């Protein structure tokens, strides 16, 4: 009897250890800065970015809500970057924009917050079985939820090519793990952000170092709502010093801060907002 109890305890311990280790996940093949990132001359054809989810609306009839999601087409793969907050809002805007879910090759998540991942239940009703590219430090709970939803978690740690001329920045080391998308164009790099929790300037500096190319354009959420005008002046100056020519700020950037970017970049500033389409050459 005692032996049976000991055996039962051992089996339970083995089970707990196996659960603690978690599932083995595949990684997107990395190309770290140390080994050198090889870039082509840049995109040959225009790349289109449609705003699906944002707390600003650009086109009448679309729904606005706190969160962010964009759809990228014109490359050799089609990309969904983040999914916003509410499944019903995501699905409504997605369908009104006429996006074909069956053509999407990758779902990529900037970070684990609900205003970027909340629309996943609506998305997996339309598209399953594709990779969801996430920073390696996402919680084990979230990874399991993705596997259970019908998506295939693909982890990133360092810069890695997603498809021709499109890269992930890799995971930024910060209390909130985050990645950005980096598009290679003939004019320079285009950086697409989710929330920029690690700091927009710190992120841009690392990307410029890792990719050894100037940053031509940056857009997305910059998470600057608490920044003073003086701090904003410094951020804008540093951004321009990094080579940024064109800029579009939205989502968590802050209304006052967006106005300052708009004024600082003038004709080189572009609006985002639900329903808007940005064409990158």
Go through each PLM region and give its residues:
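Zn-dependent metallo-beta-lactamase
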Residues: 19-75, 158-171
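Active-site neighborhood of phospho(di)ester-bond hydrolases with catalytic His/Asp-centered motifs
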Residues: 80-83, 104-112, 133-136, 191-195, ...
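Active-site metal-binding motif and surrounding structural segment of the metallo-beta-lactamase
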Residues: 88-133, 209-218, 237-240
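Cap/insert and terminal regions of metallo-dependent hydrolase folds
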Residues: 119, 189, 195-276
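Bacterial N-terminal signal peptides that target proteins for export
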Residues: 1-7
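Metallo-beta-lactamase
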Residues: 134-179, 185-186, 240, 270-281
